[in-house]
């Protein structure tokens, strides 16, 4: 998934020269937002150069939720949609009110 799809998207969308830089997956994990457990995640930055969020749940699987950036931009992506951004941008996982929202998260470092 990463080397065939996500890596090339990072190179293209952020104008990173693949001949001069390498992408290193610092961490990858699944986050489960559940109305009975972790409902949200407060504003934070990630400890890497780039962050990728791949939505695993369909919008019909939960109510509420989404990713919101400090500037007010809110994205409620559907299953298979991907959000890529600088890890230095403050963002949060908005509260879900029912159901389960799952996302696959990658923390990426750009190495010269």
Show the residue positions of the predicted features.
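Fe(II)/2-oxoglutarate oxygenase catalytic core
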Residues: 1-82, 88-112
């Amino acid at each position: 998934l990463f080397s065939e799809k996500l890596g090339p998207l990072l190179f293209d969308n952020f104008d990173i020269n693949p001949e001069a830089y390498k992408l290193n997956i610092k961490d990858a994990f699944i986050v489960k937002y559940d109305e009975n457990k972790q409902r949200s995640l407060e504003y934070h930055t990630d400890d890497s150069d780039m962050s990728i969020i791949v939505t695993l749940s369909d919008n019909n699987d939960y109510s509420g939720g989404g990713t919101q950036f400090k500037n007010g931009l809110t994205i409620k992506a559907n299953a298979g949609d991907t959000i890529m951004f600088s890890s230095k941008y403050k963002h949060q996982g908005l509260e879900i009110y029912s159901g389960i929202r799952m996302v696959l998260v990658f923390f990426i470092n750009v190495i010269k």
